[in-house]
Amino acid sequence: MLSLFITSAVIIVVIQMLFFILAAYFKTDKVTDLSYGLTFVIVSWVIYNNSLSYGHANFVVPLMVTIWGLRLSGFLFVRILKTKKDKRFDGIREDFLKFAKFWLLQGVAIFIIMLPAIVGTAKDGRTFGAISIFGFLIYLCGVITETIADYQKFMFKSDPSNEGRWTNVGLFKYARHPNYFGEILTWWGIYIFAFTTLDGFEYLTVAGPIFITLLLLFVTGVPPLEKAYEKRYAENKEYQKYKNSTRLLLPFPKKIL
């Protein structure tokens, strides 16, 4: 198992460095998010081809990762083609070391998030019991939620009449960041699906879903958006009303839960 972790780490670093070279040379943001989802997909199938055993159950894990990864990469690529640039990299893409640091940290994040998927793909010691089914349903809810939320926000932002407005349609009527809720659910679902194969130190792969949860809640996801919205709409009473009447993540009316 250790060799598979090492193999995964090496592949992740190689992929990230290749995309970094492209992004740095052409001074482009178009490959950044594309590389993120694709790295998960590539690593999953490499691990499957080198897995400790082959079976129906461990085939499902890379399939789950692939559906999530290709969907996310495709969406982000279409979005960056429309927006032309990613504001996150303003002042960074021109600085070689800072830009390289971002790609390195992205590689580290991918490895940590992937931990349960690596084990779940490499081992086939389970049947499709209640835990696996529950995990798959959680995953499915996550992917569907993230897909719907991304589509709704993209379409809203694509409408010129919504210029300067915050997204408040569909799932966003109930939560300000339902897409992040979907992504968190996705990775907890993958961990739960793989749970019955875990043994000993492998239970520590729970670090994967914990990491993505904390990352989105406290670092790269929610905080910068909340800060930007608060700054932009600080004097807007309608936004403050919207903020106070919605949840942060969970896309349900407050009256329900």
Where are these predicted regions, by residue range?
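Short, amphipathic, aromatic/basic-enriched membrane-interface segments that mark the entry/exit
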Residues: 3-7, 24-32, 101, 173-178
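Hydrophobic transmembrane alpha-helices
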Residues: 4-16, 39-69, 113-152, 157-257
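Generic alpha-helical scaffold signal
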Residues: 12, 25-32, 54-60, 83
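C-terminal ends of transmembrane helices
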Residues: 17-28, 74-81
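Juxtamembrane helix-capping/reentrant segments at transmembrane boundaries
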Residues: 28-38, 84-102, 165-172
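Select subsegments of transmembrane alpha-helices in polytopic membrane proteins
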Residues: 32-34, 97-110, 176-183
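Active-site His/Glu-centered metal-binding helix of metallohydrolases
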Residues: 35, 73, 108, 144, ...
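A basic- and aromatic-enriched beta-loop-alpha substructure that forms the phosphate/nucleotide-
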Residues: 57-93
